[in-house]
Amino acid sequence: MLVTIWDQLTPPTKLDLEAGTRYRKRDLLAAMLVCSANDAASVLAGSGRASYGDFIARMNKRAKRLGAGNSCFLNPHGLDLPGQYSTARDSAIIAYHAYHDPLIRHLSVMESLPFQYADGRTSILHNTNMLLLHRPPYFNGLKSGFTILGGKCLVATSKYDGVETIIVMLDSTPQDVFQDAEKLLQWRLKRLKENM
């Protein structure tokens, strides 16, 4: 995938990709899932304004087809933009489908990722999901994020005895989001064990 000047200007870039360089889709997806690389999300969306707009339209259409009808996406990375919105329920629906993609699930639990730049440099990217540091029992993914309007957000997944759980936390704080998520996952695990 070719990086354009449009991608290079995506704030905050995270990777500082240079216009004119090329990367594999898988490497960009990995950077996006591991360290929230917004510039990687922009490149994956196709960058040029026509294809970028087409990507956003397809993204909204797909979300609605999955049942996430209370969302309107205006960019591929989720940064605040007037008119862009979603709900915890829609986030859970989308996460459910992402969770069942083996590549996304694998990449979302990588604690770190060696990322090779087009010029040969390598940088170690660290996962923004702090649940990975002390993995609650049966925790197995997915993604954290932050925006000014949305606060600290997290979608966390777990699986116990064949039962999958997805929790979505929106508008939390960096101090609370991971502790609260861990408490919710522990509570869910306890309830599952009680009902067996």
Task: Place the predicted regions along the sequence by residue.
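Active-site-adjacent loops and short helices of periplasmic peptidoglycan-processing enzymes
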Residues: 1-89, 98-99
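Domain-terminus/edge residues, biased toward the C-terminal soluble/receptor-binding domains
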Residues: 68-72, 80-196
